[in-house]
Amino acid sequence: MLWVSYGKVSKEGMKGMITNPQDREAAVAKLVEGLGGKLISYYMVLNGDMDFIIITDFPTEKFEENLLINSMLVRGSGAIKSVATVPAMRAADAVGQMKKAQQMASAMLYEAPSKT
């Protein structure tokens, strides 16, 4: 299953990037692989709202099992101010979900509050 993590680098982490510029992709990949996943991509965005986006692929049970460990390791390092992770799917894989929603909508399984 795909997971998208995004977050902010701490002031301390930003100082470290300026003091010792380096590509952190290998370090991120090592952590992800150590937790049973695979790094798909890692981006620095530095736009004010967030500083990085990481896309990983984990078996669901592995990710949920290791989410707290990941959070403790990354946030405990002092380099990261905040991080959030959400599940994701490729657009082509979402078609099945769209079809299921279409079937449910046509069966009127959900009625909006304004309709009752």
Give the predicted meaning of each segment.
Residues 30-33, 74-76:
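Short, conserved catalytic or adaptor-binding loops enriched in Gly and charged residues
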Residues 36-40, 80-82:
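A short, amphipathic edge element
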Residues 1-31, 38-40, 44-50, 64, ...:
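Short S/T/G/P-rich N-terminal loop/turn motif that feeds into the first structured element of a domain
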Residues 8, 53-59:
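Short hydrophobic/aromatic beta-strand micro-patches
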Residues 57-87:
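An amphipathic, aromatic/His-enriched active-site/gating alpha helix that lines ligand/cofactor pockets
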